[in-house]
């Protein structure tokens, strides 16, 4: 998750194309709410310590050095500058490293310290506003957010591609997929317990306020509970799952070709999938979402060695992205041979285009032929 702001111009166009979605993005507000985090070294360190992330990008660049040798590279949202430095070390003639935040100065320092300052030019600013002196052969970016599309940074990558990538250029990564899978988990019980503790505390507060100050706050109890139900039960939960928590077949709900994708294609994601249950006598407590990206080059200019970066549950540990857990309330008892049918919709929040609102309609088709009524739930990826 690198740092680069979505310009007001592109956001306005996105809103117009949607027929009235989010308002035009205020860059100062967007920076304060989102990008400022990426200006801190502690946050950059968290990403740089993610071995899965680092190994995938390092392998993609150096195992496919022919894409970089003697070429012009654009790093969108360079952050610490690590991808720009690798691109230079792989033989790039010139690297333009665009960064929105003051992390740009640290990126310049790292380029100098690693003897590539003559190749890597760090440009602080919005990708939508930056003007390069030439077209580029490669666009490299670590733009992925939770469940791939949270943060909406891919918009800026698309803008960069459409403005600056040569017709025979390549994207790093070149492809991406979003996955959904049925899981078992105790998170629902834990979150329900947290909710009840919060409500118990509220009830004591109501009693004390009336007792000490003569004001009855009980009229707000319903709103307080709804607020906390959203937080505890209807918000996506970050988790690093173990593979044995996945109780059925995972399904791809979205595939993206980074060379051709448009903002319209990613502004709203819709899918209908059927996921067979593979474990007997268990409970479907939630759905889990993750993503993978691939470095394949292009048809005209393929990679010598394809590399995959996956954020799927892994016995060897996870990534800083983890997986997103979407609680299903109520959970369902399931058996091997049952099928879970899910209709999924994800759209950008009207309040903040970097956050996502999701709706799941799920129904269980038992192996006996019995079909349970469909249940619809809303989940917020914030």
Swiss-Prot record:
Residues 189-229 are annotated as: Dimerization arm. This is Protein arginine N-methyltransferase PRMT10. It comes from Oryza sativa subsp. indica. Signal peptide: none annotated. One of its GO terms (cellular component) is nucleus. Its EC number is 2.1.1.319. It catalyses: L-arginyl-[protein] + 2 S-adenosyl-L-methionine = N(omega),N(omega)-dimethyl-L-arginyl-[protein] + 2 S-adenosyl-L-homocysteine + 2 H(+). The lineage of its organism: Eukaryota, Viridiplantae, Streptophyta, Embryophyta, Tracheophyta. The gene is PRMT10. Residues 7-17 have a biased composition (Low complexity).
